[in-house]
A protein has these predicted regions:
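Beta-propeller folds
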Residues: 1-139
Length: 139
């Protein structure tokens, strides 16, 4: 049986929390050989940006391990607080900007046991719109 109620006063199972905590934004799509990478911003993890990969076999998963300080990587750059691309990938080598400490890290997908290798030191420096130049060995 239905109930009549004034406009805007009926109960709803959808709350602002339902919408905001389940939101996932996708960005920064890149292709490296048979692999596709992208960043997911997850509201359920306080807006943390996570790097994901779909390999040639169709398997999807998070790519990066913990930082050397045992932090979850937040793939984000603070250039102008908007950034640009916060990671680059070439031939399975990933360079990523971690918002937690502002540093760049290198990660080799084929040699996972090496973990994240810091490329920069701590400091008030911003990195953004990353690209890898393998010919000159530059990021």
């Amino acid at each position: 049986m239905s109930t009549t109620a004034p406009f805007g006063t009926w109960p709803s199972p959808i709350t602002p929390g339902t919408i905001t905590t389940r939101t996932v934004l996708l960005s920064q799509v890149r292709v490296d050989g048979a692999d596709t990478y992208w960043v997911e911003q997850r509201a359920s993890q306080a807006g943390r940006n996570v790097l994901l990969r779909r390999n040639g076999d169709g398997q999807i998963g998070e790519v990066l391990p913990l930082t050397p300080a045992d932090e979850l990587v937040d793939v984000r750059t603070r250039v102008h607080e908007y950034g640009g691309r916060a990671y680059a990938v070439d031939s399975g080598i990933i360079v990523v900007s971690h918002a937690g400490d502002g540093r760049l890290y290198r990660y080799d997908v084929a040699h996972r046991m090496r973990g994240l290798v810091p490329l920069t030191i701590y400091g008030d420096v911003r990195h953004g719109d990353l690209e890898i130049d393998t010919g000159r060995g530059l990021v």
